[in-house]
Design a protein with these regions (language model features):
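Bacterial N-terminal signal peptides
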Residues: 9-19
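Charged, low-complexity intrinsically disordered terminal segments
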Residues: 21-126, 130-156, 163-485
Length: 485
């Protein structure tokens, strides 16, 4: 999601909160989903080591596709990389590859450039939980939301890329320049994993269940395209996306040309899926299923690393973290700092939760607002977006969910548990290899004052988070809207 759209989404949420449209937490039984089971598979897993390679792998897979490409994403940008990948998908469809894209509708308006592609006989695009408002911008969208919040609050947050049912990419990335290090303004530090093996069949079934459900509709039912103008809007957008971007396109092709064979690790992989019943009862199917499976695989962990862009507990209860601490586990949290967060709402609530976590002796690493990644094409500011949990440096969760109420109760998510010490060590290295350059270590000094330390730098005030933020943070807290975050 681009920064401009994130800001606009915040405006929409603000309007909804101001009008009093905040849902309450559902009643959840203590043993909810405790009996849910998933099948463990042997698979080959490859942690894609850089952001540019994550995009290059997708292009390479599309060019090699022979039969089918299935995808699910929360957002797909109309920018250089977003349009480049769509064009590659169109070329695959020209070779008789069946292309299916399920896309959340929150950020799709009257985007004829996208609906254009659905005219191709081998391309189908469906929108999840679509809005009625398409042409009135965010004001119309916000009004639509405020009058039908119970339905429209649920969003599709999965990120899924499957080629020929043989190769699959999962992780936290949506599709756009800023997810792969190619934005000139700001980028996300994120993660993707490439899979091969029998586990993909389970994701095939999950994809088909959503594709066939009442919750998705063909894009051209909502965005009308004239047959005589076939591909005109897409071609125009593609030309605009390429304009003055020759160096970026050349660099992407160079990345593809120099791709090595993936260094796969053999591992036991267990898929975790959400339930579409969540759209009716808002219960935390995915969160509970994931935690139950973790307990089965690691009953008494001694160490846990939790990586999430947003750390907002459900109903102010850190149930998962408290359970770890009760078992004497050392808990490390890696998340955004107040200044590095791409959400205008999260810092307002995270401020108090930081203190609670420090009270629990959680080790906290906060991402710097001016963090620069050496593998990004443009060395600009970045936002932390990695979503993973690692138990005992052995069992690793990789998926689409954040550590917040929205992922628990409102969004549809997916993920996997990977049982492999070698893979877990790779993930920890991936997250922390630039530790001093990218993170503040947050703790309390002897007097009890909160401090942020990085190398020889010591801060006693929230780094790069000015007093100008205090008023909006106060207003956001008064709205009591954590359930929506």
């Amino acid at each position: 999601m681009t920064l401009s759209k994130l800001k606009t989404a915040c405006i929409m949420m603000l309007i909804a909160l101001v009008t009093g449209c905040v849902q309450s937490y559902p009643d959840v039984e203590p043993d909810f989903e405790a009996n849910w089971q998933s099948t463990e598979h042997q698979a080959e897993v490859y942690l894609i080591p850089t952001a540019p390679e994550a995009f290059a792998r997708r292009i390479e897979l599309v060019r090699q596709a022979k039969h089918s490409i299935d995808m699910t994403y929360f957002s797909w940008e109309r920018d250089t990389l977003g349009l480049m990948l769509l064009n590659e998908l169109k070329q695959a469809a020209d070779r008789d590859v069946r292309v299916r894209l399920t896309l959340d509708d929150l950020l799709v308006f009257n985007d004829k450039w996208l609906a254009d592609l659905d005219s191709h006989p081998n391309i189908e695009i469906r929108l999840f939980n679509p809005f009625d408002s398409r042409k009135a911008g965010w004001i119309g969208r916000a009004f639509n939301f405020s009058t039908n919040q119970k339905q429209l609050d649920n969003r599709l947050h999965e990120k899924y890329f499957n080629v020929d049912h043989q190769s699959m990419i999962l992780g936290g990335r949506n599709i756009g320049d800023d997810y792969f290090g190619y934005s000139e303004n700001a980028n996300f530090f994120d993660m993707d994993v490439l899979f091969k093996g029998g586990v993909i069949a389970a994701f095939d079934r999950n994809y088909q269940a959503l594709w066939s459900s009442e919750h998705v509709v063909p894009i051209q039912e909502r965005i009308k395209i004239k047959e005589m103008e076939q591909y005109q809007a897409f071609s125009k957008a593609l030309d605009k996306g390429k304009k003055n971007k020759a160096l970026i396109i050349s660099e992407v092709e160079n990345q593809i040309k120099h791709l090595d064979q993936p260094s796969f690790i053999s591992a036991s992989v267990t898929p975790v899926f959400d339930s579409l019943k969540k759209l009716n009862d808002n219960k935390p199917y995915f969160r509970q299923r994931t935690e139950h499976l973790m307990k089965q695989k690691v009953p008494s962990p001694s160490a846990a690393v939790i990586s999430t862009p947003y750390m907002i507990p459900s109903d102010n209860q850190f149930v998962f973290i408290d359970a770890l601490i009760q078992q004497q586990a050392e808990v490390t949290l890696i998340t955004n700092s107040s200044a590095s967060n791409d959400s205008g709402f999260i810092p307002a609530y995270y401020e108090k939760h930081r203190q609670t976590l420090l009270d629990k002796n959680v080790n906290i690493l906060e991402y710097k607002s001016q963090a620069i990644h050496d593998d990004h094409y443009f060395h600009v500011d970045t936002y932390y977006h990695n979503k993973t949990v690692i138990l005992d440096q052995r069992v690793t969760y990789i998926g689409s969910s954040n550590f917040d109420p929205r992922s628990d109760f409102l969004n549809v998510e997916l993920g996997v548990l990977i049982d492999s010490e070698a893979f877990a060590q790779q993930v920890i290295h991936y997250l922390t290899r630039q530790k001093e350059e990218l993170f503040w270590a947050v703790s309390r000094d002897e007097s009890g004052k909160t401090t942020w330390v990085s190398g020889e730098q010591i801060q006693t005030k929230n780094p790069n988070y000015s007093s100008w933020n205090k008023l909006p943070d106060w207003l956001f807290r008064k709205m009591d809207g954590e359930f929506e975050l």
